[in-house]
């Protein structure tokens, strides 16, 4: 019988549930996002002569507030809680994510100090990005003293992507965070005030190779989804234990792990996915290079640790051999090539590649010590790197005012600018892993975790690579303090308040983390809870014991 009216029809009851958006827990991300949006509005409606001061204050206040909110959330997170999931379990708030966000925000604030520095009325960025290098339009903008203040909202969106990248709880959210982080950086790399063609070439290379790696990452997600039927990390982990949706589907998982690994290893900059780093680091504005070499590396490794320790935590035997090979190639190849470099920014780029290999030894360990060791290493390396690039911005060619990249021009710097030379020497010693610096504690932590996991051959390669890298670090120190100043000696600028603060922050962090690492390792970096039960204690030594799922 066909019902004659709606009253005779029984409709199903539909229950809808609003998403669990805890704005307080998401506040560090929301503050940075709001600053980026407001910055765009400022560019649209505020007169050009007032934008610099407004954008600088807005960006620094937003990052500072987000950092304080992150610290408050660390203290408010219950001691017996692994963490919380928000927004349909797409975002996670746990101790590792809060730690990585705090480090990223601190490094972003230090980089913003370099970005905001102006010398003789000029910043490190071109006056008009759309101008063709060498054109009349560009010269007009240079003569007018134009400031490209759009860099501030772009930096805010990049920092937002870095934060979300480390807090994503599924692959789709992580991919979105990857693009939010990467797209602004592609633009920022092409905005250098000097050597415009070189800067735009670096941006183009970074964009093309970045798009290539993103495609690998996305195809890997598709493969994992075909195997697990889900993109949530917890569901992928469960599928790895149970065998997936279909019999014989393990090749899908292995291909997915490999392709996702390629996408993430590109962002980290390991061999053989490192070729973009030297060109981009050299061509990009140095303040942006500082942000990429520190914040982006922290974000990429933070995301990698979550993916391999949580989503692929039950398939360690499948992905560990791949990372073994990549780590060895990265440490050996990058260390050898770095010895031949004659440009300071390219040398620091290859140094970054080598350090990525060192951190990979902690990832390979796949235990809680590896996680905490990698976290300490990333924090220590980040502050040292920002300080080193801050000094690079101060050493200029006497003829055109561009940065003095050739290492021969740094000869005798210890005589003309002893404070800057001593600061850079300290940073180089930290990169080399000399005792009483943060680099020594970081290397000791990651190598100790690798030895405990049975990766002693990997540690041997790491120690030998450290010896090779120490050669070119010490070579620069000898050049600065014991060589005669070059005929084309550079003009060393007096550090402004902003740049001086960045250098001082780097020096303080390098010494404090090297001399007093205990407070950071015990109170800042999360540790597995102490348990009396042997079974529970064994569980807490697992690589994923500190992550929320």
Swiss-Prot record:
The keyword Lyase does not apply. It catalyses: a quinone + NADH + 5 H(+)(in) = a quinol + NAD(+) + 4 H(+)(out). Belongs to the complex I subunit 2 family. InterPro entries: NADH-Q_OxRdtase_suN/2 (IPR010096), ND/Mrp_TM (IPR001750). Disulfide bonds: none annotated. It comes from the Bacteria. The chain crosses the membrane at residues 26-46, 57-77, 96-116, 148-168, 171-191, 206-226, 253-273, 297-317, 321-341, 347-367, 375-395, 421-441, 466-486, 496-516. HAMAP family: NDH1_NuoN_1. One of its GO terms (biological process) is ATP synthesis coupled electron transport. It comes from Thermobifida fusca (strain YX). GO terms for molecular function: NADH dehydrogenase (ubiquinone) activity; NADH:ubiquinone reductase (non-electrogenic) activity; quinone binding. It is an enzyme of class 7 (translocase). Its main location: membrane. PANTHER family: NADH DEHYDROGENASE (PTHR22773). This is NADH-quinone oxidoreductase subunit N. Its EC number is 7.1.1.-. NDH-1 shuttles electrons from NADH, via FMN and iron-sulfur (Fe-S) centers, to quinones in the respiratory chain. The immediate electron acceptor for the enzyme in this species is believed to be a menaquinone. Couples the redox reaction to proton translocation (for every two electrons transferred, four hydrogen ions are translocated across the cytoplasmic membrane), and thus conserves the redox energy in a proton gradient. NDH-1 is composed of 14 different subunits. Subunits NuoA, H, J, K, L, M, N constitute the membrane sector of the complex. The keyword Membrane applies. It is a multi-pass membrane protein.
